[in-house]
A protein has these predicted regions:
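Active-site hotspot residues in diverse enzymes, especially metal/ion-binding acidic/histidine motifs
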Residues: 1-172
Length: 172
């Protein structure tokens, strides 16, 4: 999960200029990418939201071309990339292993606004359905997205040899 400072460094490494507090006239505009400049609204008051907006505008700079202000498909593509880059299924599992159970705890641990986490859950529900499993080095986890978000570690069952095979092996 990239930090805000890490995203700033990445933008600079890509030759982009970031204006961190731009006075947009519309309160609806949180960030904008034009040519080699990313501007973030001065009205963004939390680092979590600033991180999300910068990552999305950086994604636009890397993957979009032309004017996409009225292109909801490109906006959704950038948003989906953002969900995976800033949180991802493994990020949700790490937060669960750190003790998070409520949505506000997940948002705080993952350094994203709760509204972003809600959008992420809706996106993952649309992409993965109500349940998906993820294998990590800490085990296999089931993530359910409906009716509420839950993470559960799956305990593998032991393989018990069948009686017929055991007798056959003993005879050899």
């Amino acid at each position: 999960m990239p930090t805000y400072e890490g995203l700033l460094d990445e933008a600079l490494a890509r030759g982009l200029t970031v204006i961190e507090k731009y006075p947009f006239t519309s309160p609806r505009i949180r960030g904008l990418c034009c040519d080699d400049v990313i501007a973030l609204s001065e009205k963004i008051d939390t680092e979590a939201e600033r991180r999300v907006v910068l990552c999305e505008e950086l994604t636009h700079a890397m993957h979009s071309a032309g004017d996409i202000l009225d292109d909801p498909h490109m906006e959704q593509k950038a948003r989906t990339r953002n969900f995976d880059r800033l949180v991802g299924l493994r990020g949700l599992i790490r937060a669960f292993l750190a003790g998070c159970r409520e949505s506000w705890e997940f948002a705080e641990a993952l350094n994203v606004p709760e509204a972003f986490l809600s959008e992420l859950m809706a996106n993952y529900r649309a992409r993965y359905g109500t349940l998906t499993t993820v294998s990590t080095d800490q085990g296999v986890f089931a993530l359910t997205f409906e009716p509420i978000f839950r993470v559960k570690r799956l305990v593998p069952t032991r393989c018990i040899p069948q009686q017929g095979k055991r007798k056959k092996e003993e005879a050899l």
